[in-house]
């Protein structure tokens, strides 16, 4: 049995298929572009999906699907991805490293400290 793993990271979507001994039998990676405007940091969720599909296709050209017994996913940290009722992204994902609310966070921290809120 093989295990296919996918990591949707901040810089790339990576795929590795390992055998039962943990040895890689397939590896692939596709760069993901970050849209940076000032302290805004966003990515297009459709680019994540496209990279996943491309890597899956490449993997399945080498490895028969019937040999894959497990699929494992990991992803980025606390990104915000607003979606509609069908689950389609309404806009770019706002990354965890986005700084657009830095000033608001400073105000909240300062006010919480002033009120002895933990």
Predicted regions and their residues:
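Glycine-rich phosphate-binding loop plus the immediately following alpha-helix
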Residues: 97-118
